[in-house]
Amino acid sequence: MIYDIVFLFVFYFILINYMYKVISFGHRCSSASFIQNLNLKTESYPFDWLVSKLDIIKDCIETRFVHFLNVNNYIIQNTESFNMTDNVKTHICNEIAQVNIYYETDIQNIQSIQTYHYKLAINHHNLNNDNDYQYYQRCINRLYELFETDIQKYYLYFHPIMGINDFQNNKENILNEFDNFNQYIIEKTKNIFGIYFILIKHNENIKSIKLKESQKYNIFVLYCNDNFVDGGGPFMGNHYIEKEEVLSILKNIFI
């Protein structure tokens, strides 16, 4: 019995440390939280616990995070975290975030108070703190080191929640954004596979659908009930069915 337990422990350790790695690419803490819930989070990467968008992740990787790490690019903002679905607002909480204004080309976006609307916002660390700055340096170095390996890699991204009308109006742009990012990232490292989730607040008889399946990435639509909140880690409100659906999908991929 003891030997069986030891064997399973060693097997699991080898599995999560040498067979594949899972990277959180945003757009907020939900992706890192799910990796953690699956006991697959063995180390930290730079986009684990902040607000980030795919175009900014591309620029960070391309520039070796020079604009990310420049503390002069940040301002402190009192922000409000909320969901906006088909023009219906759901308040989550108030936060204090470091907003990277280098990436905010629209002055109206800089003046925005919506936490999840920013291109890059740090709401759980402070780059002016030396320990936090060193933390991000380690995360960045670790990401590039991982890119140099042949190990199987997965990246996980959750698109900000939207209403069904928002989705229908923006569907093609979202799919193009996902595809463009994947085309970029597969040129930066070997053996990487993307997993995208689009969250839609819309009551359906089905919990989710696989919107697209390819050799390089999958896209899933997760249908969320009226009391679901896209906030916290991984979600808030009445989120238990949706959480289990995501875990089930990820387990089928990873395990």
Model feature map: region roles:
Residues 1-17:
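Hydrophobic alpha-helical signal peptides and transmembrane signal-/tail-anchor segments
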Residues 18-255:
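Extracellular glycan-modifying ectodomains
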